[in-house]
Amino acid sequence: MSTQTHPLSGQELDVQQVINDIVDTKRLDILRAVNDLSLPTRRNEIADRAGTSRKTAKKHLSEFQDRGIIKTYRENIEPTAGGKVLLEAVDKCLQAIPIPRDEFAELTRTKIALTILSNLHREYQNAEEIQRKASISSTKQTVKHHLKWFDESDYNLADERGHTYRITDAGEEALIAYKELLVAAEQIIEKAEWLQRLPLENATVPVEKLADATVVASDTASPSDVLGAALRLCDLRVSRFRCICSIYNPVLFFAYKTMLDFGVEAEGILDWQSYIKADQNTFDFATHAKYEHYQPLYLEDSHTLGVGLYDDRRVAVGAYNEQGEGKHIAMIVSENPEIIEWAEGIYDSYREMANCPEENPPETSGSFDGRHW
């Protein structure tokens, strides 16, 4: 069973216990209310929708806040990308398992039940064999109690014949659904710093595919960590580079100019404020197409997302807090094909909104908001 240190709260979390805490309490109803209500919403509205007391809602919302599942601004509460994908992962599991929520809650309440079920096979085994393979310290009586529950429940997770037991189709389906939820929950915890900042409209990431992704996050003690990681990603060996940029940084821009000097085909989508700042510097390549193999584009709004696509083999996706002038940034770097495909989908959606400065020259007389790394 997986135990992880939460990067935001610093708590040591047993992931199986986290799953049970959600499905076995009002946490799930509160999480659903946060996601379903019109945004932003307030604590009392969430408590009413979840059918629970204000006190219980306050307690669970505080925990969600600490773990990056929701964000609050004054009295307003919204889910983060982490809160959205967590609810989706739990719902997917509950829809896939052949048992209702309360039975699933009982199954996940202790490690013993899950361990016993996962050590059943298609061949019949007696309780002693199951206990030995499961390597659990529980008594034979406890093992038999769980086996009897698996067999006698209305949902038939196991089949009994002559005091021997085997797993059923329903039991296998329950295990598969649980293991998928376990993987998703592990990644939601591990990538919490990034999911906390990822724009809600981009919370379509296949979280179970994030296992290979590394996370780099900046904070007050290490404000330049993400910038350093982005600089290290500058790769002269790629043949094509595409990016979305929402924070102006002349050092980063100059470093990536080297890729253009080496003939890398590139396209850059700058959000409005980044475009204005870069355009003020006539020596900055970012807004001026001084290379035949580079096309700058601009967006008419400000955004909080950055994407770098290095051919089709690596992607970096960074996001920052709406408050804090971009000083608190988290970025993932992944080579997983499904994460790359997801990021390409985001890039394409931004590209559809973008303008070509040669075809549609922007009005750049507006003021700059000072956001930078």
Task: Tell me the role of every PLM-derived stretch.
Residues 75-93, 159-182:
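Basic, amphipathic "hinge/linker" alpha-helix immediately C-terminal to the N-terminal HTH DNA-binding motif
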Residues 309-310, 314-373:
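Amphipathic alpha-helical interface segments
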Residues 232-285:
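Primarily the HKD phosphodiesterase
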Residues 65-75, 151-161:
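A short, conserved structural fragment
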Residues 3-28, 89-116, 145:
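Short alpha-helical segments that sit at the start of domains
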Residues 51-65, 136-152:
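Short amphipathic alpha-helical interaction segments
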Residues 25, 37-42, 120-126:
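Short capping segments at the starts of secondary-structure elements
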Residues 92-121, 180-242:
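Amphipathic alpha-helical dimerization/coiled-coil segments
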